Amino acid sequence: ELLDNEGFIEEALYDEESNIAKRFMPNVNYFSRYIGSNGNRYQPQKLLNNSTILLLGLGGGVSNILTLLAGLGPKKIIIIDYDNVEEGNLGRQLLYTEEDIGKPKAEAAAHAIAKINSNIIIEPYNKKIIRPEDVLEHVSGVDLVICAIDEPPFIAQRIVNKAIVTAKVPCVFGASQVSRGRVFTVIPGVTGCFDCMNLHYSMRDPQFNEQFIAFRNIEFSPPTIAYAPAIYQLTAAIVDEAVRVITRYAEPRSLGTQYEINFEDGSSFTHPTWPRYADECPTCGNGDIDKWEIFKYYEDKK
């Protein structure tokens, strides 16, 4: 029992009905380390193979998320992005080739993934997310959303947050901040949402609103700062978090908190958690948006 509790004993019976493709057996063997002797080591992979994932955004190094998902084998991936492939993308968005320059990212990505795993249903959409309805149009039947939209900062995340709360679909959010990356996960009705995080920080930090205004008013557009090995650390964490939410092979690390990765030294930690404000939040609860100053600044920026 002690060895089993410590994960040294695995369920090793061969399941002839598992119907797991050989390409996924290394995944199964990995998951079995966490399942233990009483579980079904095939179950996490089966859940992945039957899942539908909506990926929002292919900028930065996010196309690498799509590559990792292809190796995990979800049944269907819906991808949405409005940009075209540029030469400057090729140093970190390694799904694309020189032949893709000038093509819509969503279409080029779908073509590339079809070559990696032809069994995945890929639905590409060349569109920009500017309101929650743009997400809700595609969320029916989706098991998990991954939000990697980086523009406009914070506003894009709030738009997606409204949509996933309305649809009651979990979402893993990820963003890069030059030398660091952050991941946080929202499960509607279970964790606090993105607006709960805004409420939490504005209630506890007297300077939060002021700092947000200062950031919002910056007119300078910095050059793209993205280094592929660093971005891979972030995208791997995002995808693993998505797998944890879908399969529960292990507990997700970013539920109601920000999981931060330091690209320079490889360390990681979780920020203090924020709760779900069911009575105060105007998005996932019963709160009045007009009572909270922070949301006024979001509206002013639109």
Question: PLM ranges: what are they?
Answer:
Residues E1-S18, E137-L144, I149-K302:
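Glycine-rich phosphate/adenylate-binding loop
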Residues E1-I53, E299-K302:
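N-terminal charged helix/coil linker that caps or initiates catalytic domains
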Residues K75, N119-I121, P170:
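Residue-level detector of anion-binding/catalytic polar loops
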Residues T67, G71, H111, N198, ...:
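Short, well-ordered alpha-helices that flank and scaffold nucleotide-derived cofactor binding pockets
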Residues K76-N117:
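Glycine-rich phosphate-binding loop and adjoining beta1-alpha1-beta2 segment
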Residues A106-L144, A148-P153, Q157:
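A structured beta-alpha segment of the ubiquitous adenosine-cofactor-binding alpha/beta core
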Residues R41-E86, V239:
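Glycine-rich adenosine-cofactor-binding loop
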Residues N50, G102, K127, S254-Q258:
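A glycine-biased structural micro-motif
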